[in-house]
C-alpha cells in the first residue's frame, strides 16, 4: 500500500500494476491480496509474470478478476499480461528433471511481442516482464543461479517462439 500511495502522490502519471499471480489462483484470495497490497492506488494488476499460462487463459481469468475486484468495491482496474514465456502451452512432462514445470523449461517459447494491441476488454498491454533468458535458479544440473543471464535458455526460448509462430525471425 505504501509504495502505491507514494507513487500516486509523487508521480500521478505512473501506471502501476501489482502482480496478481496467474490463472490458476483462487479469485477471492488473489483479490484480498492485491487489495491489501494497495491496488486502489494503482492502474491495475499484472498477470503471468515469470510464468507460462497462455494469453487466452490468462485473459479469461483476468477479465473475471476485474469483476471480482468490482464486487469487493475496487472498480475500473486494468491489467497487463507477461507473454515472455507463454508462446506454447507447457505440458506436465515437458521439463524432465526440472524442479517445476516452468523452471528454466527448455520447451518454453516467447509469446506475443510487447504491444498495446490486446484482445481483453481491460487488458492494457502484453509485456515481457521477465527478461527472456533470466534463470529461475538451479532447476537442472549446470543451470545458473536465479536472476543470472542464461544464454542457452534465451536462445532456445526464442527459437521455440519462432518455431511456434509466436514471433517472426528477423535477419
Regions of interest found by a model, annotated:
Residues 3-6, 13-15:
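A non-catalytic structural micro-motif
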Residues 6, 10, 23-156:
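Surface-exposed substrate-engagement region within the catalytic domains
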Residues 167-168:
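Long, compositionally biased low-complexity segments
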Amino acid at each position: 500500500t505504501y509504495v502505491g500511495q507514494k507513487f500516486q502522490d509523487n508521480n500521478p502519471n505512473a501506471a502501476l500494476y501489482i502482480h496478481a499471480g496467474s490463472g490458476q489462483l483462487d479469485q477471492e484470495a488473489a483479490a484480498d491480496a492485491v487489495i491489501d497490497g494497495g491496488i486502489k492506488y494503482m492502474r491495475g494488476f499484472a498477470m503471468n509474470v515469470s510464468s507460462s499460462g497462455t494469453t487466452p487463459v490468462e485473459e479469461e481469468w483476468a477479465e473475471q478478476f476485474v469483476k471480482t475486484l468490482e464486487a469487493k468495491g475496487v472498480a475500473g482496474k486494468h491489467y497487463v499480461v507477461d507473454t515472455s514465456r507463454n508462446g506454447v502451452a507447457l505440458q506436465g512432462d515437458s521439463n524432465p528433471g526440472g524442479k517445476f514445470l516452468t523452471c528454466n523449461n527448455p520447451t518454453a517459447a516467447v509469446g506475443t511481442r510487447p504491444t498495446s494491441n490486446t484482445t481483453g476488454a481491460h487488458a492494457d498491454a502484453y509485456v515481457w516482464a521477465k527478461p527472456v533468458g533470466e534463470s529461475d535458479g538451479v532447476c537442472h544440473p549446470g543451470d545458473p543461479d536465479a536472476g543470472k543471464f542464461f544464454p542457452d535458455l534465451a536462445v532456445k526460448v526464442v527459437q521455440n517462439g519462432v518455431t511456434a509462430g509466436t514471433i517472426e525471425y528477423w535477419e
